[in-house]
Structures are given as structure tokens and as C-alpha cells.
Amino acid sequence: MLLGSHVSMSGKKMLEGSAIEAHEYGETTFMIYTGAPQNTRRKSIEDLNITKGHEVMEKYGLSNIVVHAPYIINIANTTKPETFNLGVDFLQQEIERTQAIGAKDIVLHPGAHVGAGVDAGINKIIEGLNEVLTNDNNVRIALETMAGKGTEIGRSFEELARIIDGVHNNERLSVCFDTCHTHDAGYNVKEDFDGVLNEFDKIIGVDRIKVVHVNDSKNDRGAQKDRHENIGFGYIGFDALNYIVHHDSFKDIPKILETPYVGEDKKNKKPPYKLEIEMLKQQQFDPELKNKVMQQ
């Protein structure tokens, strides 16, 4: 089963360090940012330590890794040309890094229309993706299902479908299905996941889903908040998330945890991924998980 989490990529070890961290959590795949998600400072491809990273991945059976584009990219912005242009240029660079790392998909938040309206935002995203996807490689951009916070685009399957339909080279577009986001956007992920998936299949096609973000939610369905919770401790619950992780439709695609670190003290938070992954593999909820994470 391809199950992993977001891991860090930093220091001198870069991809090698990411692979070691993922292995320590008992993962078979993982997701990384190529640098800080809040800025454009990036190391050169030569400094990403890719060869050693691949050696560690092969040693420990890690594959199908995923890259996440930084949050600062907003190609839905119609009011500031510099924001749009930065997004297009930087996304192209990130795709080059993604290809060098050997990942097939780079996850992208479609963007926010910042008050110009959904139609204007979608048209701008299409314009940006048409520009970006002229470059010659086989990396897919995985558009993420969004919670609908603020002016986010991608809160409904229909919005994502409109983007995909408008992009010329759309065989290079995939979808990242985020459980927390779709729940927060109003879809009944908890009680009727197969119904949600059938709806997705009719509107977009389930074969477009190439990444799943597995997150519980701190909020009730339809809250449009996007606040992740640890597996089984939120409003979606363990049974629904366990069902999704083991779903036949997602058998061969990476399932990535982005659940929050545990701990009241901001300086002493600990990653939950090792124990959350064990829990999902055993298909048994552990109500003591958070306490056990802090005792690690």
C-alpha cells in the first residue's frame, strides 16, 4: 500500500534526509516541498542530493513520491499581474525540480480569485496552466480539491472540471483529492464516500485522481475552514478515513497524511505519522494515539 506523509526536505541531506525520515515512519511513499512553502528561495537542482535520495528510496522500498507546490503561487489572481507572472514562472521552475527528483505529480492549490469572482479566477488559472504546460516534460499538475475558504477556487468538482476542460494539454492535469477539504467544502465524505466518488467520477473521472491527502477535520461538514486534525480525532472519523485509505480506487496511488504535529507546547510538537500509519495499516483506531506520540 502506498501510504506516507509530508516530510521535510532541508539541510545538506535534502532528498536523502526526506527518504530517511519517511522510512523511520514506516512509510512506502512521501510528499515534499522543494523549499519553504511561503517563499521562492530554492537550492539548485544539483544541491537537492537526488542520487543519494534515490539510493535510500530503493533500499527501503519508497516510491511514487509527490511534490507540493508552494502556497505563494496564485495563478488565479486577475488584479496583480506581477502575482500571476510570478506564479507561472515559479511553477515552471518547480515542475523542472519535480522532474529532476523523479516525482510524477506536483500538487497545486488552484488559486484564489481575491474578489474578482469565480469565473474570472478560473479563466486566469486556465491561462496560467496553458502557459506552464507548454514546457516539455511528463510531470502532471495535480489540482487539489479545496475547502472553499475565502475566495479559493476548487471548492467543487465542477470548478475543477471547468479548469481541466479549458486547458489544451490537459492530459498533464490530475487531481489531488483531500479528505479534509472535500468534507469542509460540504461533501459527505464521512457517511457516503462512495456516493462522493461516484459524483466525482461523473463530473471529472475518478481516473484523474493521482494523489490522496488523508486528513481528518477540526470542523463540521461544510464549514469551509480547512483545519486538519489527526486521524480519528476529527469530524470525519477513523472509520471513514480507514475506508478511504483501503479503497480499491486508490490502491495504486500515493495516500499522504498532512495531519498536525501533536503537543500543546509549540516548541515541543511531535510528528504523529509513524503511529497514524501503524493505526491505518492495522485498521484499528487507538484513542491513546496523541498521548503515545508525546511519549515517543
Curated annotation (Swiss-Prot):
NCBIfam families: nfo, PRK01060.1-1. Endonuclease IV plays a role in DNA repair. It cleaves phosphodiester bonds at apurinic or apyrimidinic (AP) sites, generating a 3'-hydroxyl group and a 5'-terminal sugar phosphate. This is Probable endonuclease 4. SUPFAM superfamilies: Xylose isomerase-like. Zn(2+) 2 binds at residues 144, 178, 213, 258. Disruption phenotype: No visible phenotype. Double cshB-nfo mutants are as cold-sensitive as the single cshB mutant. The gene is nfo. Keywords: DNA damage, DNA repair, Endonuclease, Hydrolase, Metal-binding, Nuclease, Zinc. Zn(2+) 3 binds at residues 181, 226, 228. InterPro entries: AP_endonuc_2, AP_endonuc_F2_Zn_BS, Xyl_isomerase-like_sf, Xyl_isomerase-like_TIM-brl. The keyword Metal-binding applies. One of its GO terms (biological process) is base-excision repair. Zn(2+) 1 binds at residues 68, 109, 144. GO terms for molecular function: deoxyribonuclease IV (phage-T4-induced) activity; DNA binding; DNA-(apurinic or apyrimidinic site) endonuclease activity; phosphoric diester hydrolase activity; zinc ion binding. Coiled coil: none annotated. Its EC number is 3.1.21.2. It catalyses: Endonucleolytic cleavage to 5'-phosphooligonucleotide end-products. Signal peptide: none annotated. Pfam families: AP_endonuc_2. Belongs to the AP endonuclease 2 family. PROSITE patterns: AP_NUCLEASE_F2_1, AP_NUCLEASE_F2_2, AP_NUCLEASE_F2_3, AP_NUCLEASE_F2_4. It comes from the Bacteria. Transmembrane segments: none annotated. SMART domains: AP2Ec.
